[in-house]
């Protein structure tokens, strides 16, 4: 069993404060929740198990038992998970406050050890101290944490996480912050606690302490789309789809890294608890991560032969053509924005191909097809620029005065005309590489302006940021027919 979970269960009986702070879903009556096969550590009870997604941020980091309380490390409520969460720069003073909170909630002294020894109903001889029955005493105070980076903000969720060698399918990575504190001082604190334990438990306590305080920090992971709820991927292609999140809120008004100090004044803590409530937010899924996911799916459906064709139809509306007809049954086309981008991109590229290469039918095989297959994946800027440069060079540009030029003398649709006029000021007859890159970008940015998108969705905002955006009516897209440029 998880040491942290056991400690919360036993120490919850100690006093009124502990009963309020150490309440875990994993130690209460189980309520069913959606399970997945993702393995990792539940941030709430610190046990390694199958995880479900959090209702507050939609990331997989909570177990099926703890999910009933809907706690998130981004909440604005003084529950234990939030008080164990630190952000960005952490000072020695902050770590001192964390250690003091641990000592307050999980004390070890002669009186406490005697009290638990008298109340624990073990099945062996009373004089034997089995780790099975005294697991809660074997949770040392360490600076072990799971960390995650969300658009420049780094969050550290401290706790006692067993079995660090086990599989981790979450975006969190183990971080050891003992270097920001005093190693010898932390040793002294734990040795003082350990001295009150029976000799048979001291050895196990020491082994656990050194294994969790001397480990090497892992390389920080990059958060990916697979770390979010599967429900998002099922609905992402609906342009009217919004993400629904639940956040725990209160009138707690302290600096982020000072939340663990609240329990110093018990009356103030319970006053804050009285103001606890939940807030619901509908949030737009617009972000670079989800946009890239949709554009990648569309890229797999590309029919590059269209750029050599003579079809009068738009690229997504060609039927009964072996080389140009796309799979219209794909869910990605439910998003009209993807269709608009696809049609305009291929209308423009076809005009370039027809203006510069001698091709007459979509059945012809051209080298330029390979360069076109990833033209929608603009999120990877360097790779995309190289791809467009390769495509430009395959259009057999003419070199004049150190610059390369290609022609544009083939018909284009009204949307592309507007892009040319807005970007260059006219409909040009010759184009440079920079012109082509600019035009292709604007066609995509018209609906998916990744320049101003966060990498992750707004579900990873703190409550304060969500409130600010909600007041400005900026958490959701109300009119899906309005483009990013508009």
Swiss-Prot record:
It is found in: Host cytoplasm, Host cytoskeleton. InterPro entries: Rotavirus_NSP1 (IPR002148). Residues 317-486 are annotated as: Interaction with host IRF3. One of its GO terms (molecular function) is RNA binding. GO terms for cellular component: host cell cytoplasm; host cytoskeleton. Residues 82-176 are annotated as: Important for cytoskeleton localization. Keywords: Host cytoplasm, Host cytoskeleton, Host-virus interaction, Inhibition of host innate immune response by virus, Inhibition of host IRF3 by virus, Inhibition of host IRF7 by virus, Inhibition of host RLR pathway by virus, Interferon antiviral system evasion, Metal-binding, RNA-binding, Viral immunoevasion. Residues 42-79 are annotated as: Zinc-binding domain. A motif (pLxIS motif) lies at residues 480-483. GO terms for biological process: symbiont-mediated suppression of host cytoplasmic pattern recognition receptor signaling pathway via inhibition of IRF3 activity; symbiont-mediated suppression of host cytoplasmic pattern recognition receptor signaling pathway via inhibition of IRF7 activity. Disulfide bonds: none annotated. Residues 1-81 are annotated as: RNA-binding. Belongs to the rotavirus NSP1 family. Interacts (via C-terminus) with host IRF3; this interaction leads to IRF3 degradation. Interacts with host IRF7; this interaction leads to IRF7 degradation. Interacts with host CUL1 and CUL3. The integrity of the zinc-binding domain in NSP1 is important for degradation of host IRF3. Plays a role in the inhibition of host innate immunity by inducing the degradation of key host factors required to activate interferon production such as IRF3, IRF5 or IRF7. Associates with components of cullin RING ligases (CRLs) including CUL1 or CUL3, which are essential multisubunit ubiquitination complexes, to modulate their activities. This is Non-structural protein 1.
């Amino acid at each position: 069993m998880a040491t942290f979970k056991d400690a919360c269960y036993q120490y919850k009986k100690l006093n009124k404060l502990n009963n309020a702070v150490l309440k875990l879903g994993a130690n209460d009556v189980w309520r069913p929740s959606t399970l997945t096969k993702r393995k990792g550590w539940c941030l709430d009870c610190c046990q390694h198990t199958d995880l479900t997604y959090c209702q507050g941020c939609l990331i997989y980091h909570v177990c099926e038992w703890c999910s009933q309380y809907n706690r998130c490390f981004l909440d604005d409520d003084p529950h234990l998970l939030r008080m164990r969460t630190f952000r960005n720069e952490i000072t020695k003073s902050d770590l001192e406050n964390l250690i003091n909170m641990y000592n307050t909630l999980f004390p070890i002294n002669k009186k406490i050890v005697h009290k638990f020894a008298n109340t624990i109903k073990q099945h062996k001889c009373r004089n034997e101290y089995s780790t099975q029955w005294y697991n809660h005493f074997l949770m040392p105070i360490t600076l072990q944490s799971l960390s995650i980076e969300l658009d420049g903000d780094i969050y550290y969720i401290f706790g006692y996480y067993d079995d660090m060698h086990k599989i981790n399918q979450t975006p969190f990575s183990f971080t050891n912050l003992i270097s920001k504190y005093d190693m010898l001082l932390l040793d002294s604190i734990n040795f003082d606690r350990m001295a009150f334990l029976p000799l048979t438990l001291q050895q196990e306590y020491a082994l656990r302490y050194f294994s969790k305080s001397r480990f090497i920090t892992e390389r920080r992971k990059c958060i990916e789309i697979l770390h979010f709820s599967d429900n998002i991927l099922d609905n992402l292609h609906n342009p009217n789809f919004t993400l629904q999140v639940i956040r725990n809120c209160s009138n707690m008004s302290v600096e982020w890294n000072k939340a663990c100090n609240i329990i110093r004044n018990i009356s103030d803590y319970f006053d804050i608890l009285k103001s606890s409530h939940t807030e619901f937010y509908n949030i737009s899924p617009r972000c670079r991560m989800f946009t890239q996911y949709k554009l990648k799916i569309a890229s797999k459906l590309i029919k590059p032969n269209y750029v050599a064709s003579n079809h009068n139809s738009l690229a997504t509306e060609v039927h009964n053509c072996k080389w140009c007809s796309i799979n219209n049954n794909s869910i990605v086309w439910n998003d009209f924005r993807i269709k608009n981008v696809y049609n305009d991109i291929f209308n423009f590229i076809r005009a370039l191909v027809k203006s510069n290469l001698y091709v007459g039918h979509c059945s012809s095989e051209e080298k330029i097809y390979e360069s076109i297959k990833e033209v929608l994946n603009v999120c990877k800027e360097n790779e995309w620029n190289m791809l467009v440069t390769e495509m430009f060079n395959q259009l057999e540009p003419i070199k004049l005065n150190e610059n390369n030029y290609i022609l544009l003398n083939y018909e284009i649709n009204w949307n592309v005309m507007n892009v040319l006029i807005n970007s260059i000021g006219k409909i040009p007859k010759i184009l440079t590489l920079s012109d082509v890159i600019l035009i292709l970008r604007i066609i995509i940015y018209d609906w998916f302006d990744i320049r101003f998108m966060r990498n992750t969705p707004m579900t990873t905002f703190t409550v304060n940021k969500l409130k600010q955006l909600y007041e400005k009516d900026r958490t959701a897209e109300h009119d899906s027919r309005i483009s990013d440029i508009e």
